[in-house]
Amino acid sequence: MVNYKDLGLVNTREMFAKAIKGGYAIPAFNFNNMEQMQAIIKAAVETKSPVILQVSKGARQYANATLLRYMAQGAVEYAKELGCKHPEIVLHLDHGDTFETCKSCIDSGFSSVMIDGSHLPYEENVALTKKVVDYAHQFDVTVEGELGVLAGVEDEVSAEHHTYTNPEEVIDFATRTGCDSLAISIGTSHGAYKFKPEQCHVDPATGRLVPPPLEFAVRDAVMEKLPGFPIVLHGSSSVPQEEVDTINKYGGKLEAAIGIPEEQLRKAAKSAVCKINIDSDSRLAMTAAIRKTFAEKPAEFDPRKYLGPARDNMEKLYKHKIINVLGSENKLAQLD
């Protein structure tokens, strides 16, 4: 058993309360490898932002659970080495699907876990979430639950259709489970293809597809039912067109990839939506930089020569999200 505090990590409780009060959102960036983690930590330190290192079940299997624990501890030490004396770093399980997975993460040093029972009948979701909460809270680990289903595919999570969160269920769910935050469905979706072309309209000036707006009425109804309660948005990558264009220019094939407009995420971040998940944008930034390097330097075979530019491109993306979208820069509890 390893407690997250021994690794220098923090849970989400205080940072979420501060974010709601301050009208900004904490970035939750998924990572699978060292370069992504380096880019996330460097961006967070340079912008003085709290940050959530987010790991899916599949990413944990890919990276290895033991190595992941030491990577998280190393992330804290790396932040200090870069000059941040009091980093606020969360290690969070994204879309945990069983009690056993959540328990394993808690026991190996995660400071926050998500138990996703949204695909289950309501009462089963309540029971599963409560079971995880009861275990996690013994170790001061925070728990994210979910009501509503996001469409799309990302990692091992997939759904054909989305189901908006029912605001009439949220009080009962939060009260009976004791969860610390709630992921809701308001029209975001997983992956780089968040909307079908027929759901969008074409901007006559650019010829680009423009997605439909998010269903903020659902968010507002949830906030009315649970005032001050931390809300989470999944599937919130914006799918930057410049990264898609670069990938396609250098041999990729991403047709009609479209994400969530950043102005809608800015609007969400100014409310009780205090955690916004971003994964696909990082994948796109990494892939674009690697494809560009391969095309421009076809004789290159040193991984550092293409993973380095990929890391730099991801860092640029993370800083942009922190400063220009989520508003979490200079929000560390201790700025020194």
Regions found by a protein language model. Give the residues of each.
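A short N-terminal beta->alpha junction/helix N-cap motif
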Residues: N3, Y24-N32, A59-R60, K305, ...
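Short catalytic-loop micro-motif centered on adjacent basic/acidic residues
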Residues: I26-N30, L91-H92, M114, I231-L233, ...
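Generic N-terminal amphipathic, Lys/Arg-enriched alpha-helix
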Residues: M1-P27, E300-F301
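Charge-dense, low-complexity intrinsically disordered segments
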Residues: D6, Y62, H119, L209, ...
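C-terminal alpha-helical cap/extension of soluble enzyme domains
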Residues: K249, I260-D336
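Short catalytic/ligand-gating loop segments at beta-alpha or beta-beta junctions
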Residues: L233-V239
